[in-house]
């Protein structure tokens, strides 16, 4: 596979106004993608975005590029990333585009593509697009230019799809739910889904102004959600991130329920229903208690590299249907082709309604082990993880933790940092062990 110049693991991303997140690059990217995709079928590309102010600029530039290449641009407006994947499939579009930087601040943005099936573009298609980005732009004949249109009921279509994943025999009548949409792409979707299923909804993070996405709210900052749940005595709190592919939850006591615990609840319910195909995929950062709890249910568990892309790859390699990250990306392939915060939250709410149990009771089997993370900066040059001294200290700590904890040492891919993670039932031992390894890295 050729080295990527523009496409990262999650499309093209960066600071707005700095290359490559500029209108001229978006125009060229739309044109290059259009040229490659125009050789296929429907000649329609669906474009969705989150609520960042820069989305207007970037979608207009993409539209110009796509139509110049002979493809039609179909806008769905602010829409969660998983909704774009779903609508791309059902609309029979040639591809889908999401303009979002997920959980990042408002002045970042990104552009990523979905295939006609609602999955990541194949490597050879991305490579063909990158190759064209190096070529001068041209324009098709006037009669072959693409058009621009809008799906006015896109939100309604996705709301109905989300509701269809919740059993018709159940209702959320009687539940008081706080929903935090991070002033992001779920702001007009999630509250409607939950209200239509019968719940009483209290909204926070549903007033986007283009500049406030993810600001002290959403899946990456649940303090406002926790406060509101406790203040009004809600049954549960749900926090989505800016583009709606992550979910974090808060139980009625104000405890955070993360992606590992959510994954466990969904795995157990899927097993009980007789629908679990194979096992569950987590990541190197998944809590050891998740692995132990799944093992007690007889559910196989595999770890992928950190990143929902790698989780999905390992799921596909093994033919499994369920995976996720502790950060709240939960992928249920029986329901959607990518991480979907709303659908994952509905799966947990199904378990609550089905068994008449609180979220706190459902998470009882997964008592998360304390995790200590220390970032150690080094001077560059030789990788400290190759040092015999570091290896010896790490081996000693591993022996000490055998059966009751684990360590993970990773070199950052973007800066001279070694990330030291120690996880153990005993928080004091975890802290002491992490500091020991960090000290060895510093002195290597």
Curated annotation (Swiss-Prot):
**Per the UniProt record, which residue ranges are transmembrane?**
none
- Keyword Magnesium, does the record have it? yes
List cellular component terms (GO): cytosol
Its EC number is: 5.4.2.10
What kind of modification does the protein receive after translation? Activated by phosphorylation.
Entry-linked SUPFAM superfamilies: Phosphoglucomutase, C-terminal domain, Phosphoglucomutase, first 3 domains
According to UniProt, the reaction catalysed is:
alpha-D-glucosamine 1-phosphate = D-glucosamine 6-phosphate
Cofactor binding, per record:
Binds 1 Mg(2+) ion per subunit.
Which residues are annotated with the PTM Phosphoserine? 102
**UniProt GO BP:** carbohydrate metabolic process; peptidoglycan biosynthetic process; UDP-N-acetylglucosamine biosynthetic process
Q: Where is the signal peptide?
A: none
**GO terms of molecular function:** magnesium ion binding; phosphoglucosamine mutase activity; phosphomannomutase activity
Where are the active-site residues found? 102 (phosphoserine intermediate)
Which cofactors does this gene product need?
Mg(2+)
Pfam families named in the record: PGM_PMM_I, PGM_PMM_II, PGM_PMM_III, PGM_PMM_IV
Instruction: Print the keywords alphabetically.
Output: Isomerase, Magnesium, Metal-binding, Phosphoprotein
Q: Which residues bind Mg(2+)?
A: 102, 241, 243, 245
What does this protein do, in the record's words? Catalyzes the conversion of glucosamine-6-phosphate to glucosamine-1-phosphate.
State the family named in the UniProt similarity comment for this chain.
Belongs to the phosphohexose mutase family.
Q: What is this protein called?
A: Phosphoglucosamine mutase
Annotated organism of origin: Actinobacillus succinogenes (strain ATCC 55618 / DSM 22257 / CCUG 43843 / 130Z)
Q: Name the gene behind this protein.
A: glmM
């Amino acid at each position: 596979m050729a080295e990527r110049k523009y496409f990262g693991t999650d499309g093209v991303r960066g600071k707005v106004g700095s290359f490559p997140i500029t209108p001229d690059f978006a125009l060229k990217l739309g044109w290059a993608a259009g040229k490659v995709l125009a050789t296929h079928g429907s000649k329609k590309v669906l474009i969705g975005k989150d609520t960042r102010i820069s989305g207007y600029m970037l979608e207009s530039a993409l539209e110009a590029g796509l139509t110049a290449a002979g493809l039609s641009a179909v806008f769905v407006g602010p829409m969660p990333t998983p909704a774009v994947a779903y609508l791309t499939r059902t609309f029979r579009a040639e591809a889908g585009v999401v303009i979002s930087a997920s959980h990042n601040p408002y002045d970042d943005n990104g552009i990523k593509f979905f295939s006609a099936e609602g999955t990541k573009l194949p490597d050879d298609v991305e490579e063909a697009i990158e190759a064209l980005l190096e070529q001068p732009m041209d324009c098709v004949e006037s009669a072959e230019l693409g058009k621009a249109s809008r799906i006015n009921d896109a939100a309604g279509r996705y709301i109905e799809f989300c509701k269809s994943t919740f059993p018709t025999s159940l209702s959320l009548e009687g539940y008081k739910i706080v929903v935090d949409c991070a002033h992001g792409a779920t702001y007009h979707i999630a509250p409607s889904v939950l209200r239509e299923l019968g719940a009483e909804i209290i909204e926070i993070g549903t007033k986007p102004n283009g500049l406030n996405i993810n600001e002290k709210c959403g899946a990456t900052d649940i303090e406002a959600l926790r406060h509101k749940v406790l203040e009004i005595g809600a049954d549960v709190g749900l926090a989505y991130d800016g583009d709606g592919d992550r979910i974090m939850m808060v139980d009625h006591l104000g405890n955070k329920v993360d992606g590992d615990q959510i994954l466990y609840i969904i795995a157990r319910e899927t097993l009980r229903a007789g629908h679990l195909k194979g096992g569950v995929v987590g990541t190197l950062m998944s809590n050891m208690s998740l692995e132990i709890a799944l093992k007690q249910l007889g559910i196989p568990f595999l770890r992928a590299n950190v990143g929902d892309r790698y989780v999905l790859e390992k799921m596909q390699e093994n033919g499994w249907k369920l995976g996720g990250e502790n950060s709240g990306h939960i992928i249920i392939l029986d329901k959607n082709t990518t991480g979907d915060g709303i659908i994952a939250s509905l799966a947990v709410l199904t378990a609550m309604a089905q068994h008449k149990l609180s979220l706190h009771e459902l998470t009882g089997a997964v008592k998360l082990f304390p995790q200590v993370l220390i970032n150690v900066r080094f001077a560059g040059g030789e990788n400290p993880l190759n040092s015999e001294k570091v290896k010896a200290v790490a081996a000693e700590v591993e022996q000490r933790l055998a059966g009751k904890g684990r360590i993970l040492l990773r070199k950052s891919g973007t800066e001279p940092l070694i990330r030291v993670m120690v996880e153990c039932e005993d928080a004091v031992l975890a802290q002491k062990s992490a500091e020991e390894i960090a000290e060895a890295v510093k002195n290597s």
